[in-house]
A protein has these predicted regions:
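Acidic ATP/Mg2+-coordinating residue in the GHKL
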Residues: 109
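Short conserved segment of the HATPase_c
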Residues: 114-127
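Conserved micro-motifs of the catalytic ATP-binding
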Residues: 26-31, 64, 68-74
């Protein structure tokens, strides 16, 4: 039963990714920029992946934040879901931490990390790198979508990683 639920969840994720990919490519996108509680967006994304955290026994480190950012709530939530999905996929055991540092959202995992030669290309459309080749479920679309969406929202994306030690993803928001 749990395996079937997991497969259903993954199908839902791929469908959602395809829909966001198509919407992002259209001439008119449905961005609605407004002041949003970052805490609310984070909690929604984490809630969606709660089962995966429990199933994989991955510890989540997160404390509520008071940060308000100007963004599109729906699109930012999709980005966070993609980043959590990647962190969970490539963290066989250990933890994932979410925090805010100097107004930027930081997601850090203790996963397998990304090879240094792959790092500059991880946001290219279709690029899966070494880790993606090892995991046949990898599409090479997730980080491309994250990068493209954040760029359109006027946010920044920075990824650093040490192979075998984990990955750190930082989303920067323009200061109002």
């Amino acid at each position: 039963r749990n395996e079937k639920l997991q497969q259903l969840f993954e199908i839902e994720q791929y469908t959602e990714m395809a829909l966001h990919y198509m919407r992002l490519g259209s001439e008119t996108n449905d961005f609605v920029l407004r002041k949003v509680s970052l805490d609310d967006v984070i909690k929604e994304a984490v809630h969606k992946y709660a089962r995966q955290f429990i199933r994989k026994k991955i510890a989540l480190s997160y404390e509520a934040v008071e940060t308000v950012v100007t963004t599109d709530e729906k699109w930012l939530e999709f980005v966070l879901e993609q980043l959590l999905s990647n962190a969970l996929k490539y963290t066989p055991s250990g933890s994932i931490a979410i925090c805010v540092e100097d107004g930027r959202l930081v997601i850090t995992d203790t996963g397998i990390g990304i090879k240094q030669e792959d790092l500059p290309r991880v946001c290219e459309k279709g690029y899966t790198g070494y880790n993606g080749h090892a995991d046949r479920r990898s599409t090479g679309i997730g980080l491309y979508l994250c990068s493209s969406i954040l760029k359109k929202l006027g946010h920044t994306l920075s990824i650093t990683s040490e192979e075998g030690q984990g990955t750190r993803v930082v989303i920067g928001f323009p200061q109002d």
